[in-house]
Structure formats: structure tokens, C-alpha cells
Amino acid sequence: MAFTQDLGSLPTTSFISRRVNESTFLVIEDDGYGEQPYIYIKIYKEFLLLTDTGCNNPRSTASSLTSLRQYLETYPVPQNRNQCLNPTGKKAYVVICSHCHYDHILGIPQFLSANTTIIASDFDKAFLLNDLDEHSLCKYVNVATPKYKIARWARHMNYFSLSGTAFRIQFLQTPGHTPDSLAWYDLDEHHLFVGDSFYERKRSKPIPELPDDAGQVPGLPATQAAIIFPEEGGNWIQYMASLDMLLSFVLHRNTELRHQNGLPHGPPPRVKVGCGHLTYEGDAENMIIEVRGLFERIIAGKVPVSGSGKKRGVIHDFWLESEKSKYSVMAPRHLAVEARKHFHGILKH
């Protein structure tokens, strides 16, 4: 049943919601891993389109409503006129997997009984079909790897429709964080969703309900919310190509918006970006340029390593230009070395 009658009797929950735009909501999980994944819910007449499903692991044992699906189907959201996002589960679910890491896929099993359509990138199917327990990092956090089938393999620049409904979204393959990293663009809301390809170190808009320690790496206290690359599939050469592609895409979309909505209508809208953590309505063009510039400086050796540590026997370095910086990076050292060799004499910085 939906909790819409007496708001004072609501159960405690591990989820927090915000409205992103007219059709889309952000749901943040206050999880036991300290990841605080950002889950996006776009509402259609007959469907709910989810970007990722979170950790299915509450931080507080006092929370009584800890299932994402139950939250969507029963819990009133203030920004939705105190109505739940999918009353009684009457709308079908479609899940876009931004990538396969545990903090984004552990909630999938609760949706399988609803005949959910699951979408993932077809850039490197083997990465998803083989050794998912390792590639998802589930084995390293001692949690069972979810079992699910990909119903649609997303091709680069393709659009998506299902059962006669055109979703008006466009897929963008963005390998780098992982081979299966998948972004998508909302044609109507002018919003780009990029998963864990990048995000800010700190929330530009505070979420008072959450502890402010997302993404802390144990043993390296300054690494909070670094843009992280795993040993399992991380690749800076692919990543830089993905940033170039995203920048070209966003520049084109912003040019379109200027032509369609320029003066005398006032400042035109610009493409916004929603990330897998910490950022849900940043300026896409500015953020991509800033992140790309940071990586160019790191690759050029102009940003010193701020700290190092070993994870699973592999040396990881941490880069932070200053405490005022919007971004930081943590990755296996060899990724920077390989990128430095590849881009030698090419990058501007």
C-alpha cells in the first residue's frame, strides 16, 4: 500500500529525493558502503525509466523502508505533490545501467519480478558477460553478485523505444571508467546523465539529510569523492576520447538550444549534467571542459601526486590540485603512465 494518508506515520527510509526537472527525479541512497549513489527516475505515461538501482544496503539499521522498488511504489515524495513515483507499481520499469559496479546494480534483483527491461552498453559485452563478480567489484565488498539478463544492448548514438513508446533519449558510449560506461541524453529536458565518468568533489547543492563523506577511500582521508578508476577495466586513453566525444556532443546541443531559444527570449537553456554521485544539475559543457583540463594537466605531469596507496596489490595515486579544487582523481598509477606515453606531444597543457 502507498503511504499517502498520514505523512506523520511514514516509515524511516534510506532514500532521499529531489526533483531534477519536469519529468525526472533524483533518488539518493544513504547506503552502508558510503557511496551515496545517485539514481535517476524519469516518469513516462506507462513506464518508469531508472538510471541504476543503488546498493540495496542501508547505512542505518533503523531504516525500515530500504527497498528502492518499495520506495518508488509506496513512499510519498514532497516534490511530487506528496504522491509516490509509481503508485502500486502500475508502470513498467526500464533500467539503464550506467556501468556494472556494485553500488549501481545491487538493487536490480528487486525489479526482476516486474518483467523489467534492463539496458547496458554493447561496447564490450564480454566485460559484462564474463567475470561479473570481479568486474562489478562485488567480490571485493563480499556481496553476492546480482544475476540478471540484459534485454537491450545500447549502441552508440542510438535512440530507444519500447512497446510503441519513443522514450526520446539517446545513448552515448563512454568507456574509460569502465568499458561498459554508458551515458544518455534526454532530448526534451536537455539533460545528460553520465554515471561515474565524472562528478564534483563536493555537492554544490547540500543535501542536509546525508552525511557529507561520500566516496571516502579508507586509509587515504583526502580522497573524498575522487573521480575513481578501478584496476578492473579503467582506461585513461579511452576516457579522454570519451570526454572529447561528450564535449563535441554537448557543444552541438548547446548551439541548437541557442538557435532555438536565443534573444529576445532571454538567455537560452543549456545542457545540464547528472552524475552517479554528488552532482545532478551541473553545467555539462563547463564540467566536461574542467575535467578534461584536469586530466590533461595530470597526464602532462603538471599536477603532483598528493598521495598513494595499494589496493589489491596495485599502486593507486591520488591527484588534487588544491583544497579549493572542484575535482580530484584516484587511479592505478599505470593508467597515467600509459596515457602519458600515448599522448606524448599531443595534449595542449
Feature-to-residue mapping (PLM):
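C-terminal regulatory/interaction regions
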Residues: R297-H349
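Active-site HxH/HxHxD metal-binding segment of metal-dependent hydrolases
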Residues: N57-T165, F198-E200
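Residue-level signal for the nucleotide or nucleotide-sugar donor/cofactor binding architecture
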Residues: E22, L106, G234
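Conserved beta-strand hairpin/beta-sheet module of binuclear metal-dependent hydrolase folds
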Residues: L10-Q83, W184-E200
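Divalent metal-coordination and catalytic microenvironments
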Residues: S23, K42, D52, H99, ...
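Eukaryotic N-terminal targeting leaders
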Residues: M1-N21, F25, N82-Q83, E256-L263, ...
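Active-site-proximal loop/helix segment associated with metal-binding centers of metalloenzymes
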Residues: D122-H156, S197-I227, I288, E296-S306
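Metallo-beta-lactamase
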Residues: L48-L50, C55-N57, T61-S64, Y159, ...
